[in-house]
Amino acid sequence: FVIETHLRILDSDLIKVLKQAGLKAVKVGVESFDADVLKASGRFSVSKDQQLEKIRELENNNIQVSAMYILGFPTDNEETINNTINYSKKLNTTYAQFSVWTPYPGTPVFNEYKDKIIVNNYDEFDQYNLVYKHNLFNKEHIRKYLSKAYSSYYLRINWLFKYFKSFITS
């Protein structure tokens, strides 16, 4: 089975119990490299050292890790986005998912940003389109960052080696 959780919840004992119960993969929200970006968005994270330690512990227990990252937070800039992309490669999880920060209708964040919403079609609220007026980026900028994130992550020799190794051993 697969779970989606926050790294702060996982400890060695829980990882062992989940592994014994048949856990094969974990999805975790790393979201951003930048603690200030996370804090400004009302999010939190464990330290970078703890992230790396817990991810390696999962992998050492033959549990695949998918890390999820968000680009285009309201306080993101070119440096914070590039740092997040580079950090994803440092963590080198089995999979990485990159998405665009999206204030969903019906949420408090949507109400906070309703005057900045730039699309009328709710089909575009898909985490791959910038749906609000960002102070620095437009839709094309964010799409380029998403493309850069995916291509620079999945076209690395470190990731290809890890993927084929896990494919062969599974």
Regions flagged by a language model, labelled:
Residues 64, 79-82, 86-98, 102-170:
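C-terminal accessory regions of radical SAM enzymes
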Residues 12-15, 77-82:
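Conserved strand-to-helix beginnings and helix N-cap segments that scaffold or border functional pockets
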Residues 4, 31, 53, 57-59, ...:
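Glutamate identity and glutamate-enriched acidic tracts
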Residues 72-76:
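Short, small-residue-enriched loops and turns at beta-alpha junctions
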Residues 1-66, 71:
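Conserved SAM/AdoMet-binding glycine-rich loop
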